[in-house]
Amino acid sequence: MDGDDLIASVYRKIEREKALITAASNMRQSTDNPLVQQRVDANIRDGRKNIAYLEEKMRELQLRQMKQEGASPTDKRLPPNPDGSAPVPPPKDYAPGYSGHEREYGDASGAYPHGGAGTMPSGAPFADPRPFAPVPKARPNYTKLDLIKYDTPYLGPKIQLMLSQLEFKLSVEKQYKAGIEKMVRLYQDEGDRKSRQDAEGRRIESNQKIQLLKQALKRYEDLHVDIESAEAPDDESLSTPNLRKPLTGLLTLRIHAVEDVDHAASSRFSRGPETFVVVKVEDAIKARTKATRTDKWQDEPFNIEIDKANEIELTVYDKSGDRPTPIGMLWVRISDIAEEMRRKKIESEFNASGWVSADKMEHGAAHGRQDAGGAPGSSNRPPSGGHSGGPGQGYAGGAPGGASAGPVLIDSWFALEPVGRIHLTLSFAKQLKDRRPFDIGLNRQGAVRQKKEEVHEKQGHKFVTQQFYNIMRCALCGDFLKYAAGMQCADCKYTCHRKCYPKVVTKCISKANYETDPDEEKINHRIPHRFEGFSNISANWCCHCGYLLPFGRKSAKRCTECGLTCHAQCTHLVPDFCGMSMEAANQILETLIRAKNHNKSASVSSGLSGRTLRPGGPPQAPQDNVALAYPQKPVEGAYGAPQRQPSAEAISAATNTYIPPQSPTAAQRQHIPPRTSSSQSPAAAAAAAAAAATGLRTPQQASDPNRPVQPPPSSHAHYDPAAYASYQQAIPPQAMQKMGAPYGMPQQQQQQAVAPMQQQVAVKEEIPPQQPKVRIGLDHFNFLAVLGKGNFGKVMLAETKSTKKLYAIKVLKKEFIIENDEVESTKSEKRVFLIANKERHPFLLNLHACFQTETRVYFVMEYISGGDLMLHIQRGQFGLKRAQFYAAEVLLALKYFHENGVIYRDLKLDNILLTLDGHIKIADYGLCKENMWYGSTTSTFCGTPEFMAPEILLDKKYGRAVDWWAFGVLIYQMLLQQSPFRGEDEDEIYDAILADEPLYPIHMPRDSVSILQKLLTREPELRLGSGPTDAQEVMSHAFFRNINWDDIYHKRVPPPFLPTISSPTDTSNFDQEFTSVTPVLTPVQSVLSQAMQEEFRGFSYTADFA
């Protein structure tokens, strides 16, 4: 529909509403019945509200049409480059901050130019290059509960929500009615008269509910305006996985009155109908009000115990005859009640505090200046009357805190469907196992990581059990998974019932080439779908991954032939079965496989029964994969829309067309290159590392005059993480030229690097390697204290028996590592340590050695005795200069990680240690992810709740930008001594991250607000630091205008604070909960098999500088 037709359509809707208002006004004048007048007044009110909404849409359409017809070139979005191409990402080894090759830290061009007084930094050398850079749009400040309230001003979002909800409710009610009709026929056949009458009554009620739902759906469809906007993102709020978990607790509900409902018709001489309300929780009746003829209830409180439920349903009935008639319905999600109460609690705390959101500060509220000469902390002292330095104090203006004045209740009129409203008072008390105090203090939190589920392999799919907290649709049979567990492929996200996954015989496209599959795996029905974009305004599900499609045009595709719908990113995963349902396709394939097996001998049949007949590479981890470029080939793996089922003759004909080919043997088809572990050739790996150390130095490393002098190489081979990774994955030299060598390295130089490795390996085969100087083991150390504990194990302070040097040793149980499938994660942590060791980065914790015993593995790390920043911020508030100093050093550490393809993913105060000379060291590399360059993505759900970026919570692919979000939370905590997103449990924190806007003291310096606003941008592509220049964007911000980066890197800036200890073994800067524990290794009873011990071969390591 073009612009003129759309405007004409909206105009007709407006005229229709005006005609309805005129007719309602005439009716009101012609009657004296107060009930009729009340109903007519409600219709007029709703009509005027609808006209205001439609007129607003009309203005939007007219304005957009004027821009399209008369827009100048400058009005349009400009591409990043003049030729329209995307900006070129920097090479992986591009490090302008450290080398004299491009720009020094102290170079004037690398620092922020003085004079930019606005919120947006002017002239930053690494800012967004576009003249009209995208700016995050203001987020509407409403909740899902606001949308179902009667007087909600957000009519547009409400229409979208109700279109989806009503269509789903209608489809469920139709299924329910079909089931009841079968019961009626069954009871009729059995002659059970009483049961038949009961079922017949339920069938009548279901029919009445269907009519109500159709009436409500039509009302919203008449109001909906389909405005196609390329700029508007799709609304994915209804299809958010892993977010809305079923809740347990106590629901307090009070029903006061109903108004403006269409009462059931009654005879002329009878009294009015009796009205009552039934409350259901997950289809089970939990409460019922008394019957009334006044539409009011005086004392109807209900306390309802909720046990892992998602939704409550309120249905208003009129009883004027033998059977009650439903006249109005309302559905309320329990999680929406809990979210509304959380927001009300926060609002009550902040109302009198003087803290505001960033957008309000930009309208003249914030004029604070970040004065370099000001006293540290001059603008962020705690409010008067508070004790300075306490863990709960904040910025000037009065920090929010303390308990609210009374219990938080939700009292409002809610809209009934299709007409009317109901007055409710609601509250919900969640039952929590580990309730956090709802205050502003900072406390330690452990990181969470997605558990690796048991993998069920079927036809190349790696199915894992997944608990879904929203309505899903099975890709095989097409039925719903309602808040239930299902099976989902970890690679292609194919989703189905638990009972359906054994029936899946179509292949996983992420692991195969359809064209090379054996003929017996295919059927002759290969008709591709014709997918085209469409505006999704109702409840449609993806036929592959099963999620509800988002509202809008960007992500929704529909087949113009068979009506199948899916996500745009799932279209290449849908098989070419247009016109055939997935159940029929799988039935045909099963028949073909049975015929093939019948024609083969018993021995061959038994040999192939459990195999996936496809060549494939080494198995990949089901989680946390770098984004895969799926081959653009059709795949069997999605359900078809309900279509005609092929007849038995058609299935027989398809079976008969199959001719068993003279295929090669199973062993040839199943040939997989053997996987070589890193431990099979330790001498080769060490030799390769030695060659790499001498031959793979980048020009920046060779030409940097400011680099600290490195110690001369030792006689034994130097360990290089790139070579370690290359040999562990057994990459051949041809592939290593593409993957192992640094990005942007000339091909000739890469070949020269490979050749010495091969020569060195040959030499090592002939000449026995020299004995290492010292083989470090457990008997070299005395354990003195426990420094920390976690689900990983312990970190203990130890001293060497010979030199009395102190080290921090991280101890992990092998049994725990194997049970939790963390072997590869442990090896990855070691590789990240080697990356930090490579340049002895000043702000990263270094590794001195690794060793192992029969039951444990040990990381021997440098000991940092100053404690972590969490301890110090709890002892006293950081001033502005101190927070800026720590933030600058953390930024350089993240910059180094990102330049080496590592994202950190667990940035928090607990993981930042303070040395005795006042500088920081980032520790704990357990959640780091390697091979994450610009544009690379992964999807593992992990991190510390308060620091997790929105894209992680939304189960989306994410990249390096998650570190910059966490960096923003870190700066906020250091400046304001509280978290920007908080709640009583993890779910509330996640809700806050996705919905709340961070609040700031009214006099907070503008540059501080600006950097937090840009780092805490929910759209990752718009976040500061998300571009190809990465950390340089953040370094160029006005918040760091007075920072000389070269001086920071070389520790020439005097630190603002120096921790103190009474002796080298003083552990007073660590939590007494841990240091009071006796430092002993608890006995391990289990014995690991030889195969389990093999998993840790090659783990031992000693650094050159140790």
Swiss-Prot record:
Domain AGC-kinase C-terminal: 1041-1106
Alphabetical list of Gene3D superfamilies matching this protein: 3.30.60.20, C2 domain (2.60.40.150), HR1 repeat (1.10.287.160), Phosphorylase Kinase, domain 1 (3.30.200.20), Transferase(Phosphotransferase) domain 1 (1.10.510.10)
Protein name: Protein kinase C
Compositionally biased tracts (Low complexity): 683-693
CDD domains for this protein: C1_ScPKC1-like_rpt1, C1_ScPKC1-like_rpt2, C2_fungal_Pkc1p, HR1_PKC-like_1_fungi, HR1_PKC-like_2_fungi, STKc_PKC
Enzyme Commission no: 2.7.11.13
Family the entry assigns: Belongs to the protein kinase superfamily. AGC Ser/Thr protein kinase family. PKC subfamily.
Modified positions (Phosphotyrosine) in chain numbering: 1101
Function: Protein kinase C; part of cell wall integrity (CWI) signaling pathway composed of pkcA, the bck1-mkk2-mpka MAPK cascade and the downstream rlmA transcription regulator. The CWI signaling pathway regulates cell wall integrity and pyomelanin formation. CWI also controls oxidative stress response, gliotoxin production, iron adaptation and asexual development. Finally, CWI is constitutively required for A.fumigatus to cope with the temperature increase found in the mammalian lung environment, during infection. Modulates the expression of fumiquinazoline cluster during conidiogenesis.
Ranges where the Protein kinase domain occurs: 781-1040
